[in-house]
Amino acid sequence: MASITSRASARASCSQANTRAGRVALSGGALLRPARPARSFVPARKQQQGAVRRGGALSARASAVEDIRKVLSDSSSPVAGQKYDYILVGGGTAACVLANRLSADGSKRVLVLEAGPDNTSRDVKIPAAITRLFRSPLDWNLFSELQEQLAERQIYMARGRLLGGSSATNATLYHRGAAGDYDAWGVEGWSSEDVLSWFVQAETNADFGPGAYHGSGGPMRVENPRYTNKQLHTAFFKAAEEVGLTPNSDFNDWSHDHAGYGTFQVMQDKGTRADMYRQYLKPVLGRRNLQVLTGAAVTKVNIDQAAGKAQALGVEFSTDGPTGERLSAELAPGGEVIMCAGAVHTPFLLKHSGVGPSAELKEFGIPVVSNLAGVGQNLQDQPACLTAAPVKEKYDGIAISDHIYNEKGQIRKRAIASYLLGGRGGLTSTGCDRGAFVRTAGQALPDLQVRFVPGMALDPDGVSTYVRFAKFQSQGLKWPSGITMQLIACRPQSTGSVGLKSADPFAPPKLSPGYLTDKDGADLATLRKGIHWARDVARSSALSEYLDGELFPGSGVVSDDQIDEYIRRSIHSSNAITGTCKMGNAGDSSSVVDNQLRVHGVEGLRVVDASVVPKIPGGQTGAPVVMIAERAAALLTGKATIGASAAAPATVAA
């Protein structure tokens, strides 16, 4: 244990990389990348197809000039002279869905503005490479304010910063939550019966369906994990049964209880990450009415109040950072700006646009357009802690890390072959695709999610463990064999906020996740009981056979007070931030948008992303965001109306 502990105390640092994202414009199938000077663009499409033969050089050059003329009306702005029916702020999960659905009507012009780069990294495609994505140039690298209740710690909050957003950087887990989650929203038109068909429409499930709960014709690929650790996964399942859990064959089937142990389905396609860029946006980039700009940071929504009412006219953005020229993208008559920047940056940008609590806006000299107290409030995330244990010496080499890497930190040839030839093996896994949902105190819905990892954390902060793993690999060090159980308060009671630090839209947001601030202490109790539950599982006959003591919390952490202190000092985000532009019924003063996702007090402005979720569903939030975007697209195109419910299944359990 001494060598393990010494490694666990080593400080990890993420690999250094160029953080300046290159600007990319995608329009009518053309891929345009910046060359020198910075404002001029040259097409890369021909370069991708191979070198142009010398005899065709002049015609290729003429074609390039024509491509540029089609995209640029002047030398400074890729959108000058254009008007759009829909401007999507952000190119993440929801925006990819909307861009696909809205641009299907060739008469509508759609613009997507993404602050980050294109989605071309190999690390995004390979699920196991998630260790390289946190705190990387593909992440916003956001940290909270010091949290007094968490031993004055800052919390790192991962958010994807590229086309596809967090669907390109998350753990790929596919969770809808339970039917009761949506019924608890209490918003007209968004009950479990209303939303189920939109989950099904989005999905092509390789292992379930088609049926009442799963689809076979949607863009989003979902499948069972293609890596199994036969010894450790089997031992965990047996151990969970020993402590009283029953198996759950499908956590997304609402006809039975959400609790139990089992396999978490993943958003993958034959073992490759199936992020929403690849599933929704990339296949339609050839549409001539769809334009996508990367490296385009929106700074505010342009809103006109001259006619006595607030009307969105377009957005202001920069393709050259805080010192760059502020450019404008304009709406066509009747067009709409749709905020898809996520639960952190959507409220952040709304406030910079004058939409938010008037006192805060006035503090920073921002003119108030719509005084909405709820903007940036109601932040909900699922806080987590973990237990970790090494395996006995005779089982060294049993972990997922051993199946991928050799003792020098090099990827095993067998792992590469399994991945490339069959889409199987350790490289297809983010490590946490088995687990459980548990009621710790008889709640109607499980309050605890357990992610079982057949690999050992060397940091009590689960996200820092991923970062540390990448450091170990780069230094050619062997990662010790063991297991981890990440314990998540999946239906938290605590809430936090997103605020401003200045009037500068390039300054980082003021983040406070608010973990463990609920007045009844329910979230802390859930995590404390989760630690006890995980220890019971580790002591079971099925799992104790493999384990050699406990690394975290450690043998010295015994009493509830000691466990609570451990939780406060190690609690971390499970990266499921929602709720900061809450959807609500008429008369709900805390809401920011109505049940059609329209921002109160501003015409031509909607929010379609995780911000609108009134109460976070149990489980990861990628699938619910896709559902919301699918439904929003249908509302915008007139293919659906609020109040028309999907056919209910025969039985819908809470």
From Swiss-Prot:
Family annotation (InterPro entries): FAD/NAD-bd_sf, GMC_OxRdtase, GMC_OxRdtase_N, GMC_OxRtase_C
List of residues binding hexadecanoate: C432, R451, Y466, Q486
Residues involved in FAD binding: T93, A94, E114, L162, S166, N170, A171, T172, L173, V298, G622
Regulation of activity: Activated by blue light and repressed by red light.
Places the protein is found: Plastid, Chloroplast
Main location: plastid
Keywords: Chloroplast, FAD, Flavoprotein, Lyase, Plastid, Transit peptide
One GO CC term, this protein: chloroplast
EC number: 4.1.1.106
Record flagged with keyword Hydrolase: no
Cofactor(s) required for function per UniProt: FAD
Record note on biotechnological use: May be used in light-driven, bio-based production of hydrocarbons. The oleaginous yeast Yarrowia lipolytica expressing FAP from Chlorella variabilis under blue light conditions produces odd-numbered alkanes and alkenes, which could be used as drop-in biofuel.
Catalytic activity of the protein: a long-chain fatty acid + hnu + H(+) = a long-chain alkane + CO2; hnu + hexadecanoate + H(+) = pentadecane + CO2; hnu + octadecanoate + H(+) = heptadecane + CO2; heptadecanoate + hnu + H(+) = hexadecane + CO2
Enzyme class of the recorded protein, top EC level: lyase
Biophysicochemical property: pH dependence: Optimum pH is 8.5 (with palmitate as substrate). Optimum pH is 6.0 (with octanoate as substrate).
Manner of cofactor binding, per the entry note: Binds 1 FAD per subunit.
A GO biological process held by the record: glycine betaine biosynthetic process from choline
Gene Ontology molecular functions: choline dehydrogenase activity; flavin adenine dinucleotide binding; lyase activity
Annotated transit peptide: 1-62
Family: Belongs to the GMC oxidoreductase family.
Function of the molecule: Catalyzes the decarboxylation of free fatty acids to n-alkanes or n-alkenes in response to blue light. Substrate preference is toward fatty acids with C16 or C17 chains. Converts n-octanoic acid (C8 chain) more efficiently than palmitate (n-hexadecanoic acid, C16 chain) into n-heptane (C7 chain) and n-pentadecane (C15 chain), respectively, partly due to an autocatalytic effect of its n-heptane product. Saturated fatty acids are converted to alkanes, not alkenes. The decarboxylation is initiated through electron abstraction from the fatty acid by the photo-excited FAD.
Stated name of the protein: Fatty acid photodecarboxylase, chloroplastic
The gene coding this protein: FAP
